[in-house]
Amino acid sequence: MSNAPILLTPGPLTTSIRTRQAMLVDWGSWDRDFNQLTASVCEQLLAIIDGASSHHCVPLQGSGTFAVEAAIGTLVPRDGKVLVLINGAYGQRLAKICKVLGRTYSTFETAEDQPTTAADVDRLLAEDSAITHVALIHCETSTGILNPLPEIAQVIKHHGKRLIIDAMSSFGALPIDAREIPFEALIAASGKCLEGVPGMGFVFAEKNALAAAEGNAHSLAMDLHDQHAYMAKTGQWRFTPPTHVVAALHEALQQYNEEGGLPARHQRYADNCKTLLDGMAAIGLRSFLPAEIQAPIIVTFHAPTDARYQFKDFYERVKAKGFILYPGKLTQVETFRVGCIGVVGADGMQAAVNAVAEVLREMEVLDI
């Protein structure tokens, strides 16, 4: 495993040996010990947002997008209307989910380097009383932009509407307190800032809203009301759970708490981000976002303009030096992305910068 590349991606990401070793044990999906493992995971997840008194944690098999679709399909009534706030590819995905589910929705889109503002949301809600829910990406992973969640949440509360937060790339590293930020649902997954492996999403659903959601869901497997009710009654998952993923997440959460929880995880990622930004700037690579709206999760860089630069060749050369990058998902500008998260520290980030510099020299890329 020592020769395995470091994943500088927004998830899946590099995991610890302890987390990987936790998957060497097989679990019976209906066994009491596994039920206790699931309950412990949910309890620890709720503690991160101080949400035990206000929200249920409902785990779901699959990717984070499965959980996002389940949250919208379960919690938005069939006669509801969702305002989708978009400034990147994952906001676009929220809108596509609403369309496929047959939920009425409207969109408000800003440029990929412009956060949605609370004033925007205030105006949009004042103009359309039919809106029941607002769906927001906290950290838009396609660029790394951070949207102003606390301010937007208060505006939504003021209008008496309900907030659904896709916190896939922020949960566990950026503070979100359920006692201070009103939301009906917050969605995240195992393979991001918690440094588990992919395969399980989870939804923090406001207790009263979840209780009232019976019959809303478009799907049996993605019915969060039924999933929670069955778990509350039996301690078990309704359908075969990703046992090894749950075990890995339980171990990753132990390491999360040993490290110092959210403040320590945030600080390490912030240090990684600073090392990355400073190092890339020193070799002439420009970041896509200004620092004040850059989340310490993933950084997007403008691609060099030199004709000798080709991303596929660049990617393979950097990979050969031990680092896996991520292509940009922007439609307007050619970019590439470098993640700051996973089991990596500032020294690893500096090594990645050095690898990028070496590759650009090898490719004779001069015009950056």
Swiss-Prot record:
Signal peptide: none annotated. It catalyses: (2-aminoethyl)phosphonate + pyruvate = phosphonoacetaldehyde + L-alanine. Its EC number is 2.6.1.37. One of its GO terms (molecular function) is 2-aminoethylphosphonate-pyruvate transaminase activity. It is an enzyme of class 2 (transferase). The keyword Transferase applies. GO terms for biological process: organic phosphonate catabolic process. Involved in phosphonate degradation. This is 2-aminoethylphosphonate--pyruvate transaminase. It comes from Pseudomonas putida (strain ATCC 700007 / DSM 6899 / JCM 31910 / BCRC 17059 / LMG 24140 / F1). The gene is phnW.
